[in-house]
Amino acid sequence: MTNITLSEVVELYSERCGNPHLTVYDVSGVNRDKEFFEPSKQVGDDTSNYQVVPPHYFACNLMHVGRDMVLPISQNHTDKNKYVSPAYTVFRIKENDFLLDDYLFMILKSKEKDRYFWFHTDSSVRDGMSWEDFSSIEIPLPGIEVQREYVAVYKAMQHNLNAMQNKLDDLKLVCDAYIEQLRQQYPPTQNRKVHHRSR
């Protein structure tokens, strides 16, 4: 297995949407769980300079690494363009036959890389990270078949975790409903005053 720097396999991408009237429902953000979310919390008065994130491309906010202690990054897994504010950095994988985009995203999502990103933030007020520092990071590069195996195992684990979380959520709903039923059947009695006889 060899190591490569991100600069060898990724490149910046810059495409402005050109639409000055995007709404919060058109614009995406990236959360700490490294997922796109809509609607965005807010948009500017003129959104024509908002950036396009095509399918399979990545968006990250390098300025929030120090604040969030994680790198807010996500990949567009849909078949439609997403739009993000100019605060985000958009990049893509260079054309190649030796790196899977799912494998790269899996590596960039890891807690180990988050610690590395946080440690290498700059000394600015926001504790951000420059593109140069980000793209100089090394990642392990196994063979393409090994990458596929890693991704398959990772996705299976994520699926199991999500299934378990859904079951826990369902169990919580059942428990909450049962507790509410008990409250209605057995309402709390009012505190009664106890009178002590004087001697």
Model-inferred region functions:
Residues 1-17, 136, 140-199:
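Non-catalytic DNA-recognition/assembly elements of restriction-modification systems
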Residues 81-87, 122-148:
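A short glycine-rich beta-alpha junction/loop motif
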Residues 7-46, 84:
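DNA target-recognition patches
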Residues 55, 59-109:
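A short beta-sheet element
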Residues 113-117:
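Periplasmic-binding protein-like
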